[in-house]
Curated annotation (Swiss-Prot):
Molecular function via GO: structural constituent of ribosome
Subcellular location: Plastid, Chloroplast
Gene: rpl34
Native organism: Olisthodiscus luteus
Sorted UniProt keywords: Chloroplast, Plastid, Ribonucleoprotein, Ribosomal protein
Name of the protein described by the UniProt record: Large ribosomal subunit protein bL34c
Family that this chain belongs to: Belongs to the bacterial ribosomal protein bL34 family.
Amino acid sequence: MTKRTLEGTKRKSIRKSGFRARMATKLGRKVLNKRRQKGENS
């Protein structure tokens, strides 16, 4: 049987797009602030 096309690894995706990855850069912090202003996740 063939493998699935998308077999994501949790660790990689979290390191790439998790909260701490966002906080590490200026643009990432901007993203978080915009999301906080939108206020759908709180």
